[in-house]
């Protein structure tokens, strides 16, 4: 396959896979309801926990993380078929897949382009790309979550820290400049998307009205 065709295939598989929204499927087929009509309106783990409980949240979390992992692994495998003389960073495939999986999750083609915020899908992608960064990101998340009870604040801070950690880690590994740029820009896009999807949460934090972990909302 040509490099252009491989890029298209990676983008398509990641977006379509990301569009398989676990939270929506679990809420519809196990609870005969749509999680997007409750709480924050998002189809993510936190809203599933508030609305349907721990089992629903756990199933959603596992499905969302796996989407990120599988999308990136497929992207990496497909980019392995690039011609030997292709002047393309091998990291382009994994970050393209990661970004499009998050896009698919937040704007799923199968569910009216309204999904979740992509945090766990991004976490799954990071697990497949840079597993060494996950403990650091998890620590950042907990440092924000524990004193405030705000999952959203932890997610936003973690998303902001991810490109910085990626840059530092890429430089420490001695990657070529081309790969450092691809990794850092890819991480910045992923982090920026997650922050953008939390813009309503940011406003609620400013207003002192953000949901706290453990609160349960069954209606808007």
Locate predicted features.
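Helix-coil boundary and interhelical linker segments in multi-pass alpha-helical membrane proteins
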Residues: 1-9, 73-96, 127-134, 168-185
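C-terminal ends of transmembrane helices
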Residues: 23-26, 102-114, 140-149, 198-203
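Cytosolic, membrane-interface loops and tails of multi-pass inner-membrane proteins
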Residues: 24-57, 115, 203-220
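Interfacial segments of multi-pass membrane proteins
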Residues: 49-54, 75-79, 100, 118-148, ...
């Amino acid at each position: 396959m040509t490099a252009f065709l491989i890029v298209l295939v990676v983008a398509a598989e990641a977006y379509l896979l990301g569009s398989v929204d676990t939270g929506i499927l679990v809420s519809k087929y196990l609870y005969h309801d749509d999680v997007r009509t409750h709480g924050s309106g998002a189809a993510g783990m936190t809203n599933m926990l508030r609305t349907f409980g721990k089992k629903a949240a756990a199933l959603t979390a596992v499905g969302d993380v796996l989407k990120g992992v599988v999308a990136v692994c497929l992207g990496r495998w497909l980019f392995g078929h690039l011609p030997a003389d292709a002047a393309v960073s091998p990291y382009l495939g994994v970050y393209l897949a990661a970004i499009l999986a998050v896009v698919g999750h937040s704007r799923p083609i199968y569910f009216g382009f309204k999904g979740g915020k992509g945090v766990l899908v991004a976490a799954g992608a990071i697990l497949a790309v840079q597993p060494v960064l996950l403990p650091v990101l998890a620590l950042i998340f907990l440092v924000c979550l524990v004193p405030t009870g705000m999952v959203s604040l932890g997610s936003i801070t973690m998303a902001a820290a991810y490109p910085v950690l990626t840059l530092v880690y890429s430089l420490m590994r001695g990657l070529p400049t081309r790969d450092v740029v691809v990794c850092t820009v890819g991480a910045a896009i992923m982090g920026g998307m997650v922050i953008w999807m939390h813009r309503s949460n940011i406003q609620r934090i400013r207003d002192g009205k953000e949901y706290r972990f453990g609160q349960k909302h069954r209606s808007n």
